[in-house]
């Protein structure tokens, strides 16, 4: 009996990982992900098949917004029955926000959605893009008893797999750009890929994937600190149509 070979959909939204250097001009240009397997032959060693899809216009992650989250969720919903896992390539600046958003948008998720990116472009000599991409795909393709090992939205970066909605970016200069302050990593990549099976979410529901796309942006975040001016509070509470405030 042959084992089931996982099918992974690679979704490119934008970000440094999708750029290569034009050595004639020195400028960065978008990478053609249709040539992915040719540019990264190591992917042939993975026990999975890979297909790619890209946003028509790659997004600078600093410009990420609700409509982009809706598009990501829609792509996953449209392809959910065709693939065993999803890897989302994303700029690092707002990756934690997108991973967190999708973790709440994808109800009854029973397959991996792994966000990853890089600090250096994929064509750079010292790039971290190859390791992040290869291992993110490997994590997404992990299976046990013909079911995905990872069944939630995660973020993989610099040898560590995190729960997506527990991450925060801590560095724009170092390869270990993310951390999860209040929850341990779900897996770590070294000589071996070690998954903490006591921490990963396992879907116990037989319900179909339900995608929530409705957002309300009439919400503010207020960071409290000793001595905060009363006028600041008054101004925020007076914002027209404000429906909620998240206090930090």
Q: Where do the model's predicted regions map?
A:
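Short acidic, glycine-rich surface-loop motifs adjacent to enzyme active sites
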Residues: 83-95, 240-248
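Short glycine/serine/threonine-rich phosphate/pyrophosphate-binding segments
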Residues: 19-20, 94-99, 129-133
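Short beta-strand segments
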Residues: 11-13, 88-90, 114-117, 151-158, ...
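Solvent-exposed alpha-helices and their adjacent loops that cap or buttress functional pockets
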Residues: 1-4, 105-108, 114, 143-149, ...
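Accessory alpha-helical/coil subdomains and C-terminal extensions
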Residues: 4-5, 11, 15, 21, ...
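ATP/NTP phosphate-donor binding region
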Residues: 1-78
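Internal gly/pro-rich beta-alpha loop/helix module
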Residues: 115-190
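Short Gly/Thr/Asp-enriched flexible loops that form oxyanion-binding sites at enzyme active sites
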Residues: 88-111
């Amino acid at each position: 009996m042959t084992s089931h070979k996982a099918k992974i959909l690679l979704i490119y939204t934008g970000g440094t990982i999708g750029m290569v250097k034009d050595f004639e001009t020195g400028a960065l240009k978008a990478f053609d992900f249709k040539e992915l397997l040719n540019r990264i032959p190591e992917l042939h060693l993975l026990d999975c098949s890979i297909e790619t899809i890209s946003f028509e216009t790659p997004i600078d992650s600093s410009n990420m917004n609700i409509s982009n989250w809706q598009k990501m969720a829609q792509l996953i919903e449209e392809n959910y029955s065709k693939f065993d896992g999803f890897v989302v390539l994303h700029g690092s600046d707002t990756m934690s926000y997108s991973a967190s958003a999708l973790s709440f948008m994808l109800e009854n998720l029973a397959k991996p959605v792994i966000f990853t990116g890089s600090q250096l472009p994929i064509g750079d000599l010292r790039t971290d893009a190859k390791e992040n991409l290869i291992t993110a795909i490997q994590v997404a393709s992990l299976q046990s008893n013909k079911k995905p090992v990872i069944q939630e939205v995660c973020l993989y970066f610099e040898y560590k797999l995190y729960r997506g909605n527990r991450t925060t970016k801590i560095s724009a200069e170092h390869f270990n750009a993310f951390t999860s302050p209040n929850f341990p990593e779900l897996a770590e990549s070294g000589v071996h890929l070690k998954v903490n099976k006591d921490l990963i979410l396992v879907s116990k529901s037989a319900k179909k994937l339900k995608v929530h796309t409705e957002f309300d942006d009439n919400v503010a975040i207020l960071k409290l600190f000793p001595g905060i001016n009363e006028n600041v509070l008054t101004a925020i509470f007076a914002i027209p149509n404000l429906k909620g405030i998240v206090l930090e």
